[in-house]
């Protein structure tokens, strides 16, 4: 945009990264940078013996399925919830997934409920959940567990730790901290992450199974590949998760704030010395 205005710009910029200096006609220089936000990883990583017991109890309450898939989102049409439900249903329909062995848990936090578009999204999601359970569940054993309310952080950590596969499939997301929170909870290298290629977190969590959320076949393939790798290549999966865990813990919210404030201090010093 600055170049279109005819301003002198030094540096590089893309849809994901920017490091540039813009010189204004008055002689002032503006520095532009990208500072990907992160999480307080330590708050998610450490699990006490009691908390590990809570994780096991939660899994038991779900019927102790062989594999648990988890989605955690605001109930927002941009999060791709309906598309992941469609992908899950089609995998059950073709027999690629066994409803006796796999369960999908979708936690959907209420969001902008007064707006018609969000009301419609909720209606479609809940209709899909009912349809899938009507087709593939048996008494006392739903294949989709759906919750439309907020979840306390302590319980959310247990859900993260319990999940074998995390599904994060937004159509577009500047970052998506849910993906980082899930990875932070798996300091033992367990689990797998299926992540939208259009989430900002995909740049940092490049060991995830990336998918195009607009393409149901892409979501299905990524989910199946993640589940298959958990069975066939556990050591490889562990290394992938540990690599992402290291990324999240080393580039936490503290480093983010330090880098941001450091650039501000540097700019202040440069202006003072000008």
PLM-predicted stretches and their roles:
Residues 1-274:
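Catalytic cores of carbohydrate-active enzymes across secretory and cytosolic contexts
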């Amino acid at each position: 945009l600055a170049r279109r205005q005819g301003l002198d710009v030094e540096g590089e910029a893309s849809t994901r990264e920017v490091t540039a200096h813009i010189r204004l006609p008055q002689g002032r220089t503006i520095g532009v940078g990208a500072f990907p936000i992160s999480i307080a990883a330590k708050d998610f990583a450490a699990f006490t013996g009691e908390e590990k017991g809570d994780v096991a109890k939660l899994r038991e309450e779900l019927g102790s399925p062989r594999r648990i898939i988890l989605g955690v989102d605001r109930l927002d049409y941009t999060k791709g919830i309906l598309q992941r439900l469609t992908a899950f249903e089609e995998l059950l329909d073709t027999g690629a997934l066994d409803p006796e062995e796999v369960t999908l848990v979708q936690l959907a936090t209420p969001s902008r409920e007064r707006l018609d578009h969000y009301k419609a999204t909720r209606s479609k999601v809940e209709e899909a959940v009912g349809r899938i359970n009507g087709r593939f569940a048996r008494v006392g054993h739903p294949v989709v567990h759906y919750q439309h309310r907020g979840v306390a952080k302590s319980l959310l950590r247990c859900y993260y730790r319990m999940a074998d596969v995390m599904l994060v499939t937004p159509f577009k997301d500047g970052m998506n901290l849910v993906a980082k929170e899930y990875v932070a909870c798996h300091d033992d290298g367990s689990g797998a992450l299926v992540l939208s290629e259009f989430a900002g977190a995909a740049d940092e969590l490049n060991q995830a199974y990336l998918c195009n959320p607009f393409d149901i076949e892409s979501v299905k393939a990524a989910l199946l590949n993640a589940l298959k790798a958990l069975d066939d290549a556990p050591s490889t999966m562990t290394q992938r998760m540990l690599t992402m865990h290291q990324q999240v813990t080393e580039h936490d919210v503290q480093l983010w704030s330090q880098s941001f404030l450091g650039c501000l201090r540097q700019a202040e010093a440069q202006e003072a010395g000008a």
